[in-house]
Amino acid sequence: MSHNAPLVLMILDGWGYNENDRYNAIAKANTPQWDEWWQTCPHILLKASGLPVGLPDEQMGNSEVGHMHIGAGRVIQQDFTRINEAINNGKFAKNAVFHEVIDQLKKTEKSLHIMGLLSPGGVHSHEQHLFALLALCNQKKFRSVHLHLFLDGRDTPPQSALDSLKCLNEELAKHPVATINSICGRYYAMDRDKRWERVEPVYNLLTQGKSERQFPDAETAIHFYYKNKISDEFVPPTLIGKEHSIQDGDAVLFFNFRADRARQLTSTFLDPSFKGFERKTLPKLSYFVSMTQYDKNLLTTTAFPPVPLNNTLGEVLSSHGLSQLRIAETEKYAHVTFFFNGGCESVFTNEERIMVPSPQVATYDLQPEMSAHELTKTLIAAINSQDYHVIICNYANADMVGHTGNFEATVQAIECLDQCMQQVWQALKNNGGKLLITADHGNAEEMFSEATNQAHTAHTSEPVPFLYVGGGWHFTHSEGSLIDIAPSLLALLGITPPPEMTGRILLEKNHAHP
């Protein structure tokens, strides 16, 4: 390949901007490189939540939505918003997939097992979507419904499941069609890193009704776990009431709308070459319905199929004959590839990908640096190779350690990132390269909630930084949003953004003084 002075787009996952220093792990951390850049390099703040990223107003941003908007350069109506609208305008209750499944189950006198994250978080799911499904079952007078609920505590306060259960019980009083048959923390049910030892007990509970503990109702179970210092996210797979496992002829409906943490559990039912663990039983399902498409290789019946996107940043770079590298550790690999390409599985011409394995630890506060040092080494080697025109990389630390709620560990994570950024810039400088730094959403800048008096483990709605290092250019606007990143990056490369990109170019070349 030719010698290229690379342009690196560095996405610091979960690195938001907050004027308030209190509970702010980024402000508390010792970050000499970041501080120097913030004082001397052009930078602005970008909106990364709510309407500017296709979410409902005031809804916090998240990694999937953030990466899609950075890559697309336009506002994309998110699945969350799309499903909310379908509920409000009546299309949800008319969805042909839901009707077909319920009609078939009524005919065969089989059961519907609805599973998913019971949460008002709006990141992977929303409990209102479950409530809309219950209303539909009630409308169709279908009452053989079993609920298998995953608990959040990550995009919500660590102990908030009882609030959601209260809302669910109110809905069940109105629409008495279902029973709660199991609960389980998302740590087990929604793993995305091939930690099959977490998923196996969930599968055994769903298919055989097996769990270490059994409780008469979900509230009793949760009180027991809280007493034993186990918060929502980490509640082990637990049978509730009478055993109603998934049987031949039954249907499963997974109501999560976000794909990355739904794929593994789905694959235990649908992947013909599954090797994660030995399945004692494999029910022959009449349907496996997913709210959205989780993976084109997982043949679910999809209630809300994907809307294709053309001319995302990766496609534009490829069509201009430029080489690009996507690099991240396991936790965020899907984000810089699948989501960055607009939810598209295909790899563009001259697009290469490197995944650095994430460390195998129970929670990332135990290893705040995660795989950042290995990622940095690999990234520097790629810069020095001069094989790539553009490198898009993600550092997961601020988000993944921020999610643990451990303030000191998150400070360590930020300090590790600062060292990594300094090393990456040295390599870029030596190769005549340029650096754009941003984030997909906030997290580490707000680590405690005075409102709930609990650790703030969720994302925030704060803006994120957009910083340019490399000289010769300046920002023309005082603020923007994530959709402005792709057009601005193309401007640095001298490429006119395609008409599909409605984001603005925020960077302009400095005029030479006469």
UniProtKB/Swiss-Prot annotation:
The entry's free-text remark on the cofactor is: Binds 2 manganese ions per subunit.
Please indicate if the UniProt record lists Manganese as a keyword: yes
Q: Where does substrate bind?
A: 124, 154-155, 186, 192, 258-261, 332
Top-rank taxon, per record: Bacteria
Q: Which cofactor does it need?
A: Mn(2+)
Q: What class of enzyme is it?
A: isomerase
For the ligand (Mn(2+) 1), the binding residues are 399, 403, 459
Q: Which residues form the signal peptide?
A: none
From its record, what is one biological process in GO terms?
glucose catabolic process
Q: Could you name the Gene Ontology cellular component terms for this entry? A: cytosol
Function per UniProt: Catalyzes the interconversion of 2-phosphoglycerate and 3-phosphoglycerate.
The UniProt family comment states: Belongs to the BPG-independent phosphoglycerate mutase family.
For this protein, the record's NCBIfam families field holds: pgm_bpd_ind
This chain belongs to which protein, by name? 2,3-bisphosphoglycerate-independent phosphoglycerate mutase
The species this protein was found in: Legionella pneumophila subsp. pneumophila (strain Philadelphia 1 / ATCC 33152 / DSM 7513)
